[in-house]
Amino acid sequence: MAKKSMIARDVKRKKLVERYASKRKKLLDQFHSAKDPMERLEIHRKIQALPRNSAPSRMRNRCWATGKPRGVYRDFGLCRNQLRERAHKGELPGVVKSS
């Protein structure tokens, strides 16, 4: 089980990403469409002024069962250990052993 503080930090980041997603997208669209270097610089400064944790790249995929940050399968949202356990128990529909 991951530390509760780390899980809470990721939840906080997820909320920030959702809150600033539209503003960040609008600024990035303006940045990519701008031709003037000074205008691009000004837009870049606005993007940098947004909270650091509002960037989607700062989010971490975590296992929803244990909160572990590593070895997480995107399709299931589970870490490798939980995926194996639940697959053996038959709790994951459509997942079968290969041999």
Curated annotation (Swiss-Prot):
Pfam families per record: Ribosomal_S14
Highest taxon listed in the record's lineage: Bacteria
Gene Ontology cellular component annotations, sorted alphabetically: cytoplasm; small ribosomal subunit
GO molecular function: rRNA binding; structural constituent of ribosome
Segments forming a coiled coil: none
Keywords: Ribonucleoprotein, Ribosomal protein, RNA-binding, rRNA-binding
Example GO biological process: translation
Keyword DNA repair: no
HAMAP family associated with the record: Ribosomal_uS14_1
UniProt cross-references to PANTHER family, sorted A to Z: 30S RIBOSOMAL PROTEIN S14, SMALL RIBOSOMAL SUBUNIT PROTEIN US14M
UniProt record similarity statement: Belongs to the universal ribosomal protein uS14 family.
NCBIfam families documented for this protein: PRK08881.1
Subunit structure: Part of the 30S ribosomal subunit. Contacts proteins S3 and S10.
Function per UniProt: Binds 16S rRNA, required for the assembly of 30S particles and may also be responsible for determining the conformation of the 16S rRNA at the A site.
Protein name in UniProt: Small ribosomal subunit protein uS14
Protein source organism: Prochlorococcus marinus (strain SARG / CCMP1375 / SS120)
Gene name for this UniProt entry: rpsN
